Each structure stands twice: as C-alpha cells, then as structure tokens.
Amino acid sequence: MTLEKTNRMNYLIDFYQALLTPKQRNYMSLYYLDDYSLGEIAEEFEVSRQAVYDNIKRTETMLEQYEEKLALFEKFEQRQQLLQTLKRQVELTDDVSATISALENLE
C-alpha cells in the first residue's frame, strides 16, 4: 500500500466517518490510523482475517463513492492550494512593501 493511498484514505475516513457503521469505523481506524495488520484486527474482533479484509475493501469502495458524489476531499485540497497561493501572494506583497519602504527611507 502506498503512502499516497494511505493518506487519501485517512482523509476520506475523516470526512465521511459519520456515514460508516461503527464496525467499519473501527476496522478502518485500526487499519489506516493505528497501522494494525489484518491479523491483529481479526484477533481483536474474533473474526477471520478474510472478513476484515473484505470489510475494509468494501468500506474503501464506499468512501470513494461518497467522495465521487460529495467531493469533500477534492474541495478541501482546492482550498488548501488556494490558501497556499494566497500566502505566497501576501508574502510577495510584504516583500514589495518592505522594499518600497526601504526606498522611501533612502531619499
């Protein structure tokens, strides 16, 4: 599993956890947030490893479907990019203001 997928799933869990059942929330939290193995989760809940795997895969699919329809994560990423752009613009503005002040003080 790639770090990118793990990060994406962590965000999707954060955004859509209210739409999951308690069991789905538990499995996903343990697997993605707490880095439990399938075997450890299976042991904790006294179910088969395959049952945990199937539940996690179904839940991943559900989370992706929620994201397709609601786009909360996509909008979050867009807001973050716009915020970074705004911060850069403000920094540039501050730099320009400081330079103008320095020039004014030279006269």
Swiss-Prot record:
Positions of disulphide bridges: none
Organism superkingdom: Bacteria
Cross-referenced InterPro entries: RNA_pol_sigma_r3/r4-like (IPR013324), UPF0122 (IPR007394), UPF0122_fam_protein (IPR054831), WH-like_DNA-bd_sf (IPR036388)
Biological role: Might take part in the signal recognition particle (SRP) pathway. This is inferred from the conservation of its genetic proximity to ftsY/ffh. May be a regulatory protein.
Similarity field: Belongs to the UPF0122 family.
Protein name, entry field: UPF0122 protein EAT1b_2891
Species of the source: Exiguobacterium sp. (strain ATCC BAA-1283 / AT1b)
